[in-house]
A protein has these predicted regions:
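ADP-ribose/adenylate-binding Rossmann-like module
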Residues: 26-41
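An accessory alpha-helical subdomain
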Residues: 102-208
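Rossmann-fold dinucleotide-binding core
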Residues: 38-99, 109
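Short, conserved loop/helix-junction motifs that constitute active-site signature segments
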Residues: 24-27, 69-70
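Single conserved hydrophobic/aromatic residue that forms the stacking wall/gate
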Residues: 1-6, 10, 209-219
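Histidine-centered active-site/metal-ligand motif
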Residues: 5, 57, 108, 117-120, ...
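Rossmann-like NAD(P)-binding element
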Residues: 4-7, 11-22
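Short, basic, helix/turn surface patches
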Residues: 17-21, 81-88, 126-137
């Protein structure tokens, strides 16, 4: 405020409580902001606060990202935020060489449901059914490393990401694919397996993040 910055480092679950405690002592010309992964309730809070605001989400963390080279990592800036606030975070994220995208709150929640809940649920299932291996293969070890990293995250953060209203639809898609794959395996359907592998290989080839450039922040 008054060209000074005040920062608080808190867990996502305390974001709204922290804002409610400090707003009474902030000048009305302040821009309040968050970089929370979980934005449940933030849009309504901001709109009723009487303050200008900016909200963003760096889509990476210290568990898996290489913090010395973030050029392959992404950050989302919420489009409903204050213009000057968005410029501040755009400049900051450009300095870190992040790929910057501008989404609405709803688009952010949809992205989180897709890009976080699918790998989270898949990893949880792996961890739930795995057992000790004396001589694990490379793929198993890589999955284990991912599971250990993910499960080291805060319980509340994992819960809130999975409790996103859009997550059940993604989990239903996983369940459908598992059902289809199980039928192929149980029936020893070689032709079905060949078609399935062809389908998912083509899907991986077709997955491109360039389509997100339509939302990319102008630089």
């Amino acid at each position: 405020c008054d060209r000074r910055q005040r920062q608080m480092c808190i867990r996502d679950r305390y974001t709204l409580d922290a804002f409610r405690k400090i707003l009474p002592v902030l000048p009305k010309d302040c821009i309040i902001s968050d970089i929370a992964s979980v934005k449940t309730g933030l849009k309504k809070f901001y709109e009723e606060s009487g303050f200008r605001y900016v909200s963003s989400h760096p889509m990476f963390g210290p568990t898996f990202a290489s913090l010395s080279n973030l050029s392959s990592e992404n950050a989302i800036i919420i489009s409903e935020g204050d213009h000057l606030g968005k410029i501040f975070f755009k400049d900051l994220y450009q300095t870190l060489r992040l790929n910057i995208f501008e989404y609405t709150f709803d688009e952010h929640d949809e992205t989180v449901a897709y890009s976080l809940s699918i790998p989270f649920v898949s990893t949880f299932v792996f961890a739930a059914v795995m057992k000790h291996q004396e001589a694990p293969g490379t793929t198993f070890k890589k999955h284990m490393a991912i599971a250990k990293g993910l499960l080291s995250e805060d319980d509340y953060l994992l819960q809130e990401i999975l409790f996103n209203p859009r997550t059940p639809g993604q989990v239903t898609n996983i369940r459908t694919e598992l059902k289809n794959l199980l039928e192929i395996i149980e029936n020893k359907d070689a032709e079905g397996m060949k078609k399935y592998l062809t389908k998912i290989r083509e899907k991986i080839k077709s997955v491109s993040y360039t389509h997100l450039r339509a939302h990319e922040t102008r630089r």
